[in-house]
């Protein structure tokens, strides 16, 4: 399960980087070949556990880690959906989400003013705000889109070392905090049924689905305001 979620994260981030003309492999090599951090580039605020992909989240721990408890039927059902279909649905939903909220995302990433020493703290606090009122599919799409935007912003600002770290943070958060909800709500196969075949774009004229996206956008607006506060610190 953990490996599957990691695969989804890497595919989505690779896709977002490729849209800007970047290659995933060139940035993962940066982290793998990095044996020692230059003096002064790491902040005490970013703990070793965060760097190694085992962050200590401030959200309350879920009673079912990785969705392994009491969800065997959901896990079995998920295997019916090809991983490629989940990846494609995530890509399409992410594109549609960013199309609708392009300005908000641009404001958010530019206002965070991330550095290698503060990136993890900003990442964590934005997600705490994003999922403060609970989890839904729209917010999960926003989660992926935020991670992609953060990776692109990192590369644009010549902080390539953050790309693989962001992927690890996302996979860890997905496993520990989102996977239980995903399995309780039909697994990724349900996501594909709802958002596959470019359904997010096709549903733009449908009021019910539009309202779901709109509520996600309202949540994102709160994240943008939070980002503005971070920029002053």
UniProtKB/Swiss-Prot annotation:
PTM comment: the record says:
Proteolytically cleaved by caspases during apoptosis. The cleaved protein, lacking the BH4 motif, has pro-apoptotic activity.
Region described as Disordered: 29-71
Q: What is known of its domains?
A: The BH4 motif is required for anti-apoptotic activity. The BH1 and BH2 motifs are required for both heterodimerization with other Bcl-2 family members and for repression of cell death.
GN (gene name): BCL2L1
Instruction: Identify this protein by name.
Output: Bcl-2-like protein 1
Q: Which PROSITE patterns match?
A: BCL2_FAMILY, BH1, BH2, BH3, BH4_1, BH4_2
Renumbered to this chain, motif BH4 spans 4-24
Annotated motif BH3: location in the chain? Answer: 86-100
For this chain's UniProt record, which GO biological process terms are given?
A: endocytosis; extrinsic apoptotic signaling pathway in absence of ligand; intrinsic apoptotic signaling pathway in response to DNA damage; negative regulation of endoplasmic reticulum stress-induced intrinsic apoptotic signaling pathway; negative regulation of execution phase of apoptosis; positive regulation of apoptotic process; regulation of cytokinesis; release of cytochrome c from mitochondria
Q: Which organism is it from?
A: Sus scrofa
**Intracellular or extracellular location(s):** Mitochondrion membrane; Nucleus membrane; Mitochondrion matrix; Cytoplasm, Cytoskeleton, Microtubule organizing center, Centrosome
Membrane topology note: Single-pass membrane protein
Q: What are the recorded GO MF terms, alphabetically?
A: channel activity
Upper lineage is: Eukaryota, Metazoa, Chordata, Craniata, Vertebrata
Q: What is its main location?
A: mitochondrion
CDD domains named in the record: Bcl-2_like
SUPFAM superfamilies membership: Bcl-2 inhibitors of programmed cell death
Assembly information from the UniProt record: Homodimer. Heterodimers with BAX, BAK or BCL2. Heterodimerization with BAX does not seem to be required for anti-apoptotic activity. Interacts with BCL2L11. Interacts with BAD. Interacts with SIVA1 isoform 1; the interaction inhibits the anti-apoptotic activity. Interacts with BECN1 and PGAM5. Interacts with IKZF3. Interacts with HEBP2. Interacts with BOP. Interacts with p53/TP53 and BBC3; interaction with BBC3 disrupts the interaction with p53/TP53. Interacts with DNM1L and CLTA; DNM1L and BCL2L1 may form a complex in synaptic vesicles that also contains clathrin and MFF.
Q: Where are the transmembrane segments?
A: 210-226
UniProt motif (BH1) ranges: 129-148
Q: What does this protein do?
A: Potent inhibitor of cell death. Inhibits activation of caspases. Appears to regulate cell death by blocking the voltage-dependent anion channel (VDAC) by binding to it and preventing the release of the caspase activator, CYC1, from the mitochondrial membrane. Also acts as a regulator of G2 checkpoint and progression to cytokinesis during mitosis. Regulates presynaptic plasticity, including neurotransmitter release and recovery, number of axonal mitochondria as well as size and number of synaptic vesicle clusters.
Q: Where does it sit, as one GO cellular component term?
A: centrosome
The text of the family note is:
Belongs to the Bcl-2 family.
